[in-house]
Amino acid sequence: MKIAELYELYKQHPVVTTDSRKCPQGALFFALKGDSFNGNAFAAQALEQGCAYAIVDEAEYAVGDDERYILVEDVLAALQQLAHYHRKQFKIPVIQVTGTNGKTTTKELTAAVLSQKHNVLYTRGNLNNHIGVPKTLLELSPEHTIAVIETGANHPGEIKFLAEIRSEERRVGKECRSRWSPYH
């Protein structure tokens, strides 16, 4: 399925989940894989819990002729591409906050200041990775006038990749030095 087609489904069902145990009615379930789990194995459960569609990348989990299973090449890539596609529908500034320490505090303070004049979408908690950033971007709505996205990294090149997903606008680098953090 092409991203534009997946986006049409998303517009009809604008809630995304990656946890089959917490499926809001009508949500899109993205069957992500981890080191110790395969989300594809939980696709049927997600549909039973009320998800409208299950996005899977292993054909054996797309049960029978059930059209609620959407087979893609890579579930994580589909989630990231969907978020990028969705983000591009909005002509608002997106501020990226990154750094070794202090990202979450800086993001929270930036969002608080901006909320005095704007309707701000911002990363909840520290959902700042290759899964959390796309999920946050998929919360963008026409009511938002600016977004503050926290990005973290656990491997080289991840910040650049996350910036590409959200479409580069502004970047705030936050560096905090202390005796506990001699990283710079």
Task: Label each PLM-derived region with a short phrase.
Residues 77-177:
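Phosphate-binding loop of NTP-binding sites
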Residues 3-9, 29-31, 43-48, 70-73, ...:
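Short linear motifs at secondary-structure transitions and domain/linker junctions
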Residues 1-81, 85:
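N-terminal leader/targeting and accessory segments in enzymes
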Residues 50, 64-66, 116, 166, ...:
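Short, structured coil segments at secondary-structure junctions
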